[in-house]
């Protein structure tokens, strides 16, 4: 593997296979190496009976913004969920922290590029900007059906390292991600 070539790495795969878990482990690894992580996760929100009731956008180093809820009064809708239009602020926070002019010890984290995130105003432009820049390394997750719903974004992603995650390969993929992170900063 060339040093950080390409400088973006993505995971995809079916629900529940461990994409976000692998991403969090990769972020922990980067932080231990002294790398500043900038970006977001999209954790699900569960009620007391462990039923999924929504999603947040968890902006690293800032906190959570509600993305979607089953019982909300927002106008945007995706399946059973209502989408919070104000969640677009999360992307503005992330952009504010990135300096595309200088390559320093930063890593952009995107979990995930999916249908709910793409419903937010300005989100597609945000993802295109992140995918087209070549200064700051990126690790991310994209929805497994992105090639069908947003082929333009998928074309940008597939130019990079892409792992189809499975239960069988997830530990090997994590090791490859750690090696890739090392190649980007050492």
Question: Which residues does each predicted region cover?
Answer:
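N-terminal phosphate/diphosphate-binding loop that engages ATP/GTP or pyrophosphate donors
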Residues: 28-78
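Walker A (P-loop) ATP-phosphate-binding motif of ABC ATPase nucleotide-binding domains
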Residues: 8
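The conserved Walker
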Residues: 15
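Hydrophobic anchor at the beta1->P-loop junction of P-loop NTPases
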Residues: 11
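Conserved lysine of the Walker
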Residues: 19
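Phosphate-binding/switch loop-helix module in NTP-utilizing enzymes
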Residues: 74-128
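Hydrophobic positions on the alpha1 helix immediately C-terminal to the Walker A/P-loop
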Residues: 22, 26
